Amino acid sequence: MDTIYALASARGKAGVAVLRLSGPRSHEAVQAFGVLLPPLRHAALRRLTWNDEVLDEALVLLFGAGASFTGETSAELHLHGSPAAVSSVLRVLSGLPGLRAAEAGEFTRRALENGRLDLAQVEGLADLIDAETEAQRRQAMRVFSGAIGERAERWRADLIRAAALLEATIDFADEDVPVDVTPEVLTLIDGLLADLRREVDGSRIAERIRDGFEVAIVGAPNAGKSTLLNALARREAAITSEIAGTTRDVIEVRMDLDGLPVTFLDTAGLRDTSDLVESLGIERAVTRAKAADLRVFLLDDSGPLPGITVQADDLVVQGKADLRPGHGLRLSGRTGEGVPELVAAIGERLLGRTAGAGSLTRERHRLAIERAIGAMESVRAELLRGQQHTELAADDLRRAIRSLDSLVGRVDVESLLGEIFASFCIGK
């Protein structure tokens, strides 16, 4: 296997730059700089030289196979963060035999292949790197720390137990095996179904935390929507004008709201119009508003809005509070009156929804669980039809196990046989 190397820290001038190496020749590559290798997992300051020239002074860290991020023999060089110093060391590494520059994500790929991370943890690491808000960071850390894998291992153990019971009645019918294992299998299946359904119920909120919530600002033309967006963004994100219908397309502004990733949508003013371009903008506004996680209706005296109605979960705000009296939640994007209260109300609504977030943060996770649920529902139906359908139920159980493979890895035949032998003392 090749030994790979790459700059692990950000490119450009910095206090420290970290070079990472992984593979059988990583320690040998460090030694090529004329340094005395330190003990494993001990940082040591070493002078890196090449052709009698000092390239840099670096902290050197060595890791043994099985005790590194990738699971391979690895090394790290902590250099001064000079682009020239980094380039000089990379140039030497590129000329050493058996070494090559790493491809994108290759260190993490090796960690996956060597069992240091499961696939969900790899995805959690990617989400952690991309996290922009506190909620995203916390969620990504849970996944990276193995929350999905731990749950999946418990589900997997129950599935294997249920499969072992059914396979035993099929393959060892003449042996000392309980005649009817249906009640025990149904108990396992019912417990699993309850757990998995809870996870699916919470998955869409978890996906929203990862991808971000959308909050649409809806109202009639010239109601102050763009002015409100600018007040929320604290910059001129949208053009404002006294001319009704200025906003034709959806304008998006992404913000960190109480630790949640939120994209505010400034939509075209809703009204009946014969203007083709404006009508297209209104159609798009209605579509985006209906799909948004939360809608803020900015109302004035223009009456009902065409194409959309206020729902129970929507926020209704009286706009242009600086120009007209009123009661309830009122604001003025121009003066800032009521904006903090609106932000607090939006944050409260969205934070309330995150309480039900599960561990499944991606559509892939949810679809795998939904396939497993479908297979287990088939198992349940077959078992309730009678023992003559045990083989069909066993096949559905294997399908459920395969559906979870993307989360926990493959279930091999030996583990299934081991469970059978341990449970039913089959071995004569």
From Swiss-Prot:
Leader peptide range in chain numbering: none
The keyword Metal-binding is assigned to this record: yes
UniProt-annotated location(s): Cytoplasm
One of the record's GO molecular function terms: GTP binding
Enzyme type, top EC level: hydrolase
One GO term of the biological process aspect: tRNA wobble uridine modification
Binding site for (6S)-5-formyl-5,6,7,8-tetrahydrofolate: 20, 76, 116, 428
Keyword line: Cytoplasm, GTP-binding, Hydrolase, Magnesium, Metal-binding, Nucleotide-binding, Potassium, tRNA processing
InterPro entries registered for this protein in UniProt: G_TrmE (IPR031168), GTP-bd (IPR006073), GTP-bd_TrmE_N (IPR018948), GTPase_MnmE (IPR004520), MnmE_dom2 (IPR027368), MnmE_helical (IPR025867), P-loop_NTPase (IPR027417), Small_GTP-bd (IPR005225)
Record's function text: Exhibits a very high intrinsic GTPase hydrolysis rate. Involved in the addition of a carboxymethylaminomethyl (cmnm) group at the wobble position (U34) of certain tRNAs, forming tRNA-cmnm(5)s(2)U34.
Membership in a protein family: Belongs to the TRAFAC class TrmE-Era-EngA-EngB-Septin-like GTPase superfamily. TrmE GTPase family.
Residue span(s) of domain TrmE-type G: 212-351
Amino acids binding K(+): 222, 241, 243, 246
Cofactor: how and how many bound: Binds 1 potassium ion per subunit.
Predominant subcellular localization, coarse grouping: cytoplasm
A cellular component annotation (GO) from this entry: cytoplasm
PROSITE patterns: G_TRME
Keyword Nucleus assigned: no
Subunit structure: Homodimer. Heterotetramer of two MnmE and two MnmG subunits.
Binding site for GTP: 222-227, 241-247, 266-269
EC number: 3.6.-.-
Swiss-Prot/TrEMBL cofactor(s): K(+)
Protein name: tRNA modification GTPase MnmE
TM region(s), chain numbering: none
